Amino acid sequence: MRLLAPAFKFHFKGGRRTMILSVLSSPALVSGLMVVRAKNPVHSVLFPILVFCDTSGLLILLGLDFSAMISPVVHIGAIAVSFLFVVMMFNIQIAEIHEEVLRYLPVSGIIGLIFWWEMFFILDNETIPLLPTHRNTTSLRYTVYAGKVRSWTNLETLGNLLYTYYSVWFLVSSLILLVAMIGAIVLTMHRTTKVKRQDVFRRNALDSRSHIMNRTISPFGHSHRRSFSSGAGGPPDNYKETFKMWI
């Protein structure tokens, strides 16, 4: 996998790489839009799978081979399948769910404008020149120290950053996931009066004399069960003699 990303960089340069980038990004954008536009909840769960597959292709083009392989495993194998199981547990009908979409249009428009404003703000900060004099920096002398340092793989770099600089945030995210898991269990553990349940302790504590079942054997060799019950709820007085007589 380490040789896969450089191969993509070598073979796909210029127009070819831009074409592949457009081919992978366009279905991702359309699928992301269909996640919120699909009226069938099952389709809304299946569209993110296509988004994650396209995202893996984009990560391979960027040279992040480890992230490209771990993204489908985590997102498709865990999150998307979990969402699909939740939809199946809710017993949602396959028929399309009619809902007023325009009622959420103002809120979604405001969130979209905030998102685009943040994106333009980030891009403006990225285009700030390195020197305040705005001179041409191509004639400056510099030394590339990247080749003199031992190169790390994507996995080593990710592990070094995750468990050193971002260790606190890693623990916070794990606690958030733990709270979410416990909360999902607590939400499903609710009692309702519509379900018929049986009190096992009370059932076992009933008087066994009212449920005596005696197997008797007839003289002709046929076996049958005979249930004894008296008017007071107990067995008759002569059930022992009857059992001895058939034996």
Swiss-Prot record:
A Pfam match: Oxidored_q3
Annotated localization: Mitochondrion membrane
Reactions performed catalytically: a ubiquinone + NADH + 5 H(+)(in) = a ubiquinol + NAD(+) + 4 H(+)(out)
Membrane topology: Multi-pass membrane protein
UniProt keyword annotation of Methyltransferase present: no
A GO MF label: NADH dehydrogenase (ubiquinone) activity
Major localization class: mitochondrion
EC number of this enzyme: 7.1.1.2
Keywords: Electron transport, Membrane, Mitochondrion, NAD, Respiratory chain, Translocase, Transmembrane, Transmembrane helix, Transport, Ubiquinone
Functional description taken from the UniProt entry: Core subunit of the mitochondrial membrane respiratory chain NADH dehydrogenase (Complex I) that is believed to belong to the minimal assembly required for catalysis. Complex I functions in the transfer of electrons from NADH to the respiratory chain. The immediate electron acceptor for the enzyme is believed to be ubiquinone.
Family: Belongs to the complex I subunit 6 family.
NCBIfam families for this protein: PRK06638.1-4
Record protein name field: NADH-ubiquinone oxidoreductase chain 6
